[in-house]
A protein has these predicted regions:
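Iron-sulfur-associated redox domains of electron-transfer enzymes in respiratory
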Residues: 15-302
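Cysteine-centered iron-sulfur cluster-binding motifs in ferredoxin-type domains/subunits
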Residues: 1-11, 253, 257-258
């Protein structure tokens, strides 16, 4: 999950950086797009919105900006359909959007790897959408998650983001270009509030359950929300032993969800206050209605 990097008192552990790759991409003839993690809202105060990031990224030289919360809507809808099938078949499943959790399953519970949802992560969903329109596009994910780097390097999922930057890495590039985040209104919104809340522990479950309601699936599965690595391990052990009473596990390797990621810019409690203020201003669009605005048929969610 990357927590060790910031916990090590000697600074002995580091992660691969894609800063040079991103800079070279910006200098190339290819179009380069930024995909911002849902956890971004609230990290830099109540006045720094997704609109603030969109403007800053344009000033740096990126060709486009999309909030990964839109990918959250896409993942929620796809995973809802997948879970309905699994529920009817009596199969237990675990979520696939947290790479730290996926790494844990594959490393420590390899016999349960087939329980991982086949639905791609929100980051990958947005990247595939962009590349369906422009196959030569370069996609860059920015967020508080170090494990996302392992998702793009190790998991080798077709159409996934090309590079991943932490907030500090992106801000270093911004600093070199003399660009700062400026206060902006909340008029820029591409995802439902459910997609935005993917970054919170329990947010994936809420979005998937909402999608089930919107598609009138007629089922109410029991979902175990594993908050942090310790809980993830505990519930995976129960599932392995056949003693998990729930139908699905939502696994978040970081406590609090992505907002508690190892490369977060701010304290999680401080971020929560700002984040709540921002999300209250989001409109109440539904997940499935929102996805009608995008060409979902042009790429696969699995």
């Amino acid at each position: 999950c990357g927590k060790c990097i910031h916990s090590c008192p000697f600074g002995a552990i580091g992660s691969k950086t894609f800063m040079v790759d991103v800079i070279n991409a910006l200098k190339s003839d290819k179009k380069v797009y930024v995909i911002a993690a849902p956890a971004t809202e609230g990290q830099f105060g109540a006045n720094i919105t997704m609109g603030s990031w969109k403007k800053a990224m344009q000033e740096v030289g990126f060709n486009g900006f999309i909030e990964a919360g839109l990918g959250g809507d896409m993942t929620a809808a796809s995973e809802a359909a997948e879970r309905v099938e699994a529920y009817k078949a009596g199969e237990k499943k675990v979520t696939s959007c947290c790479p730290g959790f996926v790494n844990m399953v594959r490393l420590h519970f390899p016999e349960m790897a087939d329980k991982i949802s086949t639905t791609i992560s929100p980051m990958c969903a947005v990247s595939r959408m962009i590349k369906a329109q422009d196959p030569d596009a370069v996609t860059v994910f920015v967020g508080p998650c170090v494990a996302k780097k392992s998702e793009v390097v190790d998991q080798k999922i077709e159409g996934n983001a090309d590079y991943v930057l932490t907030y500090s890495e992106m801000r270093a590039i911004m600093s070199a270009k003399g660009v700062e985040l400026q206060p902006s209104d909340t008029s820029y919104q591409e995802s439902s509030v459910y997609g935005k809340r993917f970054a919170n522990s329990g947010g994936v479950t809420a979005a998937v359950v909402e999608s089930m309601k919107e598609m009138e699936a007629g089922i109410e599965p029991k979902v175990c929300k594993a908050n942090g690595a310790a809980e993830c391990r505990k519930f995976l052990m129960l599932m392995k032993a056949g003693k998990l009473p729930d139908d699905f596990i939502e696994g978040m390797a970081c406590e609090g969800g992505c907002v508690g990621g190892p490369s977060s810019f701010n304290d999680m409690l401080v971020t929560k206050k700002f984040r709540d203020e921002l999300l209250q201003k989001a409109d109440d669009r539904q997940i499935l209605d929102n996805l009608k605005n995008y060409h979902m048929e042009t790429f696969s969610m699995h």
